Amino acid sequence: MNVKAYAKVNISLDVIGKREDGYHLLKMIMQSINLYDVLDIRIIDEGIKITSNRRNIPTNDKNIAYRAAKLFMDTYKIDKGISIHINKRIPVAAGLAGGSADGAAVLKAMRDIFKKDVSDEELINLGVKIGADIPFCIVGGTAFCEGIGEKITKLRSMNGKIIVLVKPDFGVSTKMVYTEYDKCLDVKHPDSEGLVKAVNNGHFKFVVNNMVNVLENVTAVKYKEINEIKEKALEYNSIGTMMSGSGPTVFSFFDNTKEAEKYFYEMKKEYNKVFITRTV
């Protein structure tokens, strides 16, 4: 079975507290985009076999897809094995939920392959054990996510919007960013409820004008390239630009393909990982 695992961007990201176990409590609007990994998932006699087109992708339990497969097999007493080939297109350590997207795709595919009568809600409760972005990746589309990411409210679709992604040539540790965020003072927070209302009313201009990601207070301060990329996007008439997740990828919305392509080709001169895509 071939399945697509879609990346995401954060239209807003706010940290509102911290649980006793150390996980941060969040309010986020998340959006799927048409940049995806392709997973070829097949039944084998036993075990979990992971392969990939990329050498730097782990093939053991450090891989979220591996952990998702094991959790599903243990939970539903699967007596067969599974092989997963990951054709990786989503950049890693980028703030795009590349690993979580793969984990979510594995859970959904295994539900179908092994014909298990399991709801999305049950998969979400499983998935959150191994990755806070997995619940959203199971649901996809446009959604408001709360808790540590497991409380999902579907929003009106914002599909078809043109986005250019620029990932600087370094990765960022999510754990490091959240640890450093705890030391931040005087943080500007997004109007999460106002943004949710705007999304549901189709007020896209309000949405792009009011995007806030509080984690920029860490990543964009540590890496000056993030603000440089955002400034360049605005020079090329982006209608809204922000860092996704813990970074370092910057996504920028454009009104039309022509302007997006100008910016795309300009950024390709400097960065290896630049993509034109759309929201889905």
From Swiss-Prot:
Gene3D superfamilies xrefs: 3.30.230.10, GHMP kinase, C-terminal domain
Recorded metabolic or biological pathway in which this protein acts: Isoprenoid biosynthesis; isopentenyl diphosphate biosynthesis via DXP pathway; isopentenyl diphosphate from 1-deoxy-D-xylulose 5-phosphate: step 3/6
One Pfam family here: GHMP_kinases_C
InterPro entries from the UniProt entry: GHMP_kinase_C_dom, GHMP_kinase_C_sf, GHMP_kinase_N_dom, IspE, Ribosomal_Su5_D2-typ_SF, Ribsml_uS5_D2-typ_fold_subgr
Keyword field: ATP-binding, Isoprene biosynthesis, Kinase, Nucleotide-binding, Transferase
Regions annotated as coiled coil: none
Catalytic reaction annotation: 4-CDP-2-C-methyl-D-erythritol + ATP = 4-CDP-2-C-methyl-D-erythritol 2-phosphate + ADP + H(+)
Family annotation (SUPFAM superfamilies): GHMP Kinase, C-terminal domain (SSF55060), Ribosomal protein S5 domain 2-like (SSF54211)
Gene Ontology annotations of biological process type: isopentenyl diphosphate biosynthetic process, methylerythritol 4-phosphate pathway; terpenoid biosynthetic process
Binding of ATP, residues: P91, V92, A93, A94, G95, L96, A97, G98, G99, S100, A101
Gene Ontology MF, one: 4-(cytidine 5'-diphospho)-2-C-methyl-D-erythritol kinase activity
Recorded superkingdom: Bacteria
EC numbers: 2.7.1.148
Active site per database record: K8, D133
EC supergroup of this enzyme: transferase
Family: Belongs to the GHMP kinase family. IspE subfamily.
Protein task: Catalyzes the phosphorylation of the position 2 hydroxy group of 4-diphosphocytidyl-2C-methyl-D-erythritol.
Protein name: 4-diphosphocytidyl-2-C-methyl-D-erythritol kinase
The gene coding this protein: ispE
